Amino acid sequence: MDFNAIIKRVIGIITKPNQEWETIKTESSTIADMFTKYVLILAAIPAIAGLIGNLLIGRSVMGFTIRIPFSNALIWAIMMYVMTLVALYVTAFIIDILAPSFGSQKDLVSSMKVAVYASTASWVAGIFYIIPALAILALIAGLYGLYLMFLGIKIVKSPSQDKAVGYFVVVIIVQIILYFLIGFIVSAVAFGRGAAFM
């Protein structure tokens, strides 16, 4: 595992996204490489931070703090991690399926590049889940991730210029629905059906 390469990519995609997307576009990579050398490490940050936050601080519900039992917090963290990996595949698949409709080429590797590297800001900001009250900062980073997604689609997938925004909007709508469902399922399984609405 080359942690220097991971750190370099994280800094590049967050601070110089246009440049980094151009580099990513021309990189020879496989889906397995992206997962083993990048995703498996970074996607663990929100899950581990959330586990720690749920155990040490708990969840605030209507002004009351609820301490989460270890087994529930662990189930939540494992499911969140696994579902994040599944969501990446689904997102990449959607990006790829939609490509011809927006003047782009079907290529699952380039679609996975967009899904993976656009998620970087959210994963890194997932550290804020250690203190559940700061989870809003992870949400803000997620908004920056939308910008990264737009640039990634535009640069890596190279859709028709007049269709780039539409491509991005359709992918984001699908992603919002996907992540809402994942959050609901994970919370319902880990904390019970009523907790899915917390």
Where are these regions (language model features)?
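Flexible domain-boundary/linker segments
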Residues: 27, 34-35, 61, 115, ...
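Selected alpha-helical membrane-embedding segments in polytopic membrane proteins
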Residues: 2-103
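Membrane-helix interface segments in multi-pass membrane proteins
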Residues: 46-84, 122-142, 179-198
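Juxtamembrane transmembrane-helix termini
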Residues: 22-25, 56-60, 103, 151-161, ...
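Solvent-exposed, flexible loop/coil residues
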Residues: 28, 39, 106, 112, ...
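Hydrophobic alpha-helical transmembrane segments and adjacent short intramembrane/lumenal linkers
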Residues: 94-178
